[in-house]
Amino acid sequence: MNAINVAQEVIDIEVNGLLYMKDRIGNEFELAVSKIQDTTGRVIICGMGKSGIIGKKIAASFASTGTPSFFMHPGEAFHGDLGMVKPEDIFVAISNSGETDEVLKLLPFLKDNQNYIIAITGKRESTLAKNAHCHLDIAVPKEACPHQLAPTASTTATLVMGDALTVALMDARGFSPESFARFHPGGSLGRRLLSKVRDEMHCKLPIVSTDASFTDVVS
């Protein structure tokens, strides 16, 4: 196949993976949204490798849309970062296999700390899924990688599950453009949402006549 055919096949596989996931969205998704909405703590996202990279994006999306959240690397967690975890925090653990050792090692602490655990995995019968209070299924029929090794369709499914949670929480909270502007004061979004006429208008305008000399203009 040429590069265009490969690209089209990859997109087809990943779209089919998302449709497969869509058909299985159910009560546990509603439960996850409800628990996150009602918590008085933060939402801590955790994952290794590609799952961790996707987790960072999910945490950033949560934080910028009214859900206090941050990413915690499981390796760093074992070297002091667990001190940031409060009992009222919700812990979202991401692992496609549900057997990532670095993530599983956190379970005893989380249970002892009485944290509510949401697992995002592609295997409902995995150790992580079975030890979570709520499980979000991101299983896909196959990866786009021809060798079924590189995370592709599964990471896309994880990302979209995170987006679905983010938007569902925005809807549940009635998150408005004004709320969005509060968290995005910089960049083009901030300027578009927050700029007022008084910020751009000035009283002292440098007015010169058409017959003024260049020396007068620059002075």
Question: What is each of the regions a protein language model found here?
Answer:
Residues 2-41:
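An N-terminal, well-structured beta->alpha segment
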Residues 19-25, 68-71, 94-97, 205-209:
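Short, flexible loop segments at the rims of nucleotide/cofactor-binding pockets, characterized by
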Residues 28-32, 77-81, 216-217:
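Short acidic active-site motifs
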Residues 41-48, 52-160, 166-169:
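Glycine-rich phosphate-binding loops that contact phosphosugars or nucleotide phosphates
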